[in-house]
């Protein structure tokens, strides 16, 4: 009735395993999120930027975040602005990016067609960019979005209204200097 082969397997299983002399070894490995991401490490995470530009002399290179391929700062310490270049999948949508900027400034919602009417086409060397400007009572976003191959290249200026007013022409000139390589 009782099968001998099952009995042997069960008996064998009771005899196998760790013996008392086997020590348990613990390993600790740092989580990847604990890694400090420097500007150079972050740049390596992005595709190469397909264009060149002329950076205004008053801009200083800033620290990257996980979204920007390169960053600069401009303005005083009391009213700094941040300029970033980021590459996103074209599937993310041009209109969605522009509407998102309005949301970041907590501006009233508008129909997408109405928002897009405020966007200006700018002819660049090798591409056409979309220029837009938004501001609330204290803060401004100036931006250029350049569709190129399968990406949207986002060039964004965000800072206080006073700094934005002073730096607008330099930022616009920077955007217009973009040259596709």
Regions found by a protein language model. Give the residues of each.
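Bacterial N-terminal signal peptides
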Residues: 5-15
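Extracellular/lumenal carbohydrate-interaction signature centered on repeated Trp-anchored short motifs
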Residues: 93
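Extended beta-strand-rich segments in extracellular/periplasmic secretory proteins, especially
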Residues: 130-132
